[in-house]
């Protein structure tokens, strides 16, 4: 581990020198590339330096304790110093092991989220709306930007499906765990008998793909335009500004009608199409290797039930890690940190097991 950390520190110092080179400063591509690499190494290198400093202080204190030429008072001070430093050294070492775990190459990317009402009709569509609000509020808490891409509204104010983009550093690293089926248990407002109904909505979280990762030949894409519509199907725009893209080789279809400009809708739809194709390529690659990461939380299957939201008991349960929280209202208000942090820790523990 420490050999690897030493190599990373050398590379970090090399990058510092390169970023001070006028030739690099005048080349925007190299400057961006080296700055990004340096930023990725920053936390690990700074923690490694802190570890070396603390570890050295511990060794010096130990040496003083073992030095019989020193008086008892000095050796007692050295012992106290050791007792203070030992847990700090162990904690820093544990943190460094986590920082060296394999990184998901998509973790720093923006995401495209698709929420669909599944089993449960109108109630499932309303729940899809609740999930959309939950994710937008969570994004606000992270200072991320949310852009609505496409929405298929129901008359009661829910969504048959809604697609939106979240722009923010590390968005995929936190939201990737939301892939799967979400179940709700509650008494519908239209239910006079007070019976609890169970409905589901599915969530797909796709990392935004760059053009260099997925190149789409526009000859393979059919572009249709139509009039955008809002809740209840009413027209909200008299111009043909909404765009539907059909990728002929894969059969994937993407719509976008949120913007008033046809050009902007087409750009947004292309982002979704590129993300879906990237996701499809990744899935096919995983199947070919027949090795979806054992370290992943659950199977990542979008049909897998990952979480239950129980309204009568104000309870949220994540079935993958057996976590139950008695604060449903706060979770739906975007307070997802406790759940996401627990899922990240669980994934790290699995990766540590695989590395041993």
From Swiss-Prot:
Gene3D superfamilies listed in its UniProt record: 3.30.160.20, 3.30.70.1660, 6.10.140.1950
Primary location recorded for the protein, binned into one broad class: cytoplasm
GO CC terms: cytoplasm
Protein family: Belongs to the prokaryotic/mitochondrial release factor family.
Compartments where located: Cytoplasm
Modified residues (N5-methylglutamine): 234
Protein name: Peptide chain release factor 1
The keyword Hydrolase is assigned to this record: no
Keywords recorded for this protein, A-Z: Cytoplasm, Methylation, Protein biosynthesis
Listed SUPFAM superfamilies: Release factor
Disulphides: none
Family matches, as SMART domains: PCRF
GO MF annotation list: translation release factor activity, codon specific
InterPro entries: PCRF, Pep_chain_release_fac_I, Pep_chain_release_fac_I_sf, Prokaryotic/Mito_RF, RF-1
PTM text: Methylated by PrmC. Methylation increases the termination efficiency of RF1.
Domain of life: Bacteria
UniProt function note: Peptide chain release factor 1 directs the termination of translation in response to the peptide chain termination codons UAG and UAA.
């Amino acid at each position: 581990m420490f050999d690897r950390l030493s190599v990373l520190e050398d590379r970090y110092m090399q990058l510092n020198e390169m970023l001070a080179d006028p030739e690099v400063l005048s080349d925007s591509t190299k400057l961006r590339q080296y700055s990004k690499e340096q930023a990725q190494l920053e936390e690990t290198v700074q923690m490694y330096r802190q570890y070396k400093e603390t570890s050295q202080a511990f060794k010096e204190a130990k040496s003083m304790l073992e030095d019989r030429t020193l008086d008892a008072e000095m050796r007692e001070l050295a012992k106290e110093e050791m007792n203070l430093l030992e847990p700090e050294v162990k904690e820093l070492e544990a943190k460094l092991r986590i920082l060296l775990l394999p990184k998901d190459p998509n973790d720093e990317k923006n995401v495209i989220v698709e929420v669909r009402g599944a089993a449960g009709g109108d109630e499932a569509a309303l729940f899809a709306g609740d999930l959309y609000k939950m994710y937008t509020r969570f994004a606000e808490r992270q200072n991320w930007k949310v852009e609505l891409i496409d929405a298929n509204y129901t008359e009661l104010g829910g969504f048959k499906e809604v697609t939106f983009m979240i722009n923010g550093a590390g968005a995929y690293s936190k939201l990737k765990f939301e892939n799967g089926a979400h179940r709700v248990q509650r008494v519908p407002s239209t239910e006079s008998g007070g019976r609890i109904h169970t409905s589901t909505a599915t969530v797909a979280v796709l990392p935004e793909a760059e053009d260099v990762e997925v190149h789409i030949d526009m000859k393979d894409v059919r572009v249709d335009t139509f009039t955008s519509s809002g809740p209840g199907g009413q027209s909200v725009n008299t111009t043909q500004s909404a765009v539907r893209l059909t990728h002929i080789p894969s059969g994937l279809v993407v719509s976008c009608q949120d913007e008033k400009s046809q050009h902007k809708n087409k750009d947004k739809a292309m982002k979704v199409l590129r993300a879906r194709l990237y996701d499809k390529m990744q899935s096919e690659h995983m199947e070919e290797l027949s090795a979806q990461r054992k370290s992943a939380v659950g199977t990542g299957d979008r049909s897998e039930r990952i979480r239950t939201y129980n309204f009568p008991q104000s309870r949220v349960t994540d079935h993958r890690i057996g976590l139950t929280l008695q604060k449903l209202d706060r979770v739906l208000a975007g307070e997802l940190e406790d759940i996401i942090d627990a899922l990240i820790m669980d994934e790290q523990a699995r990766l540590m097991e695989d590395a041993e």
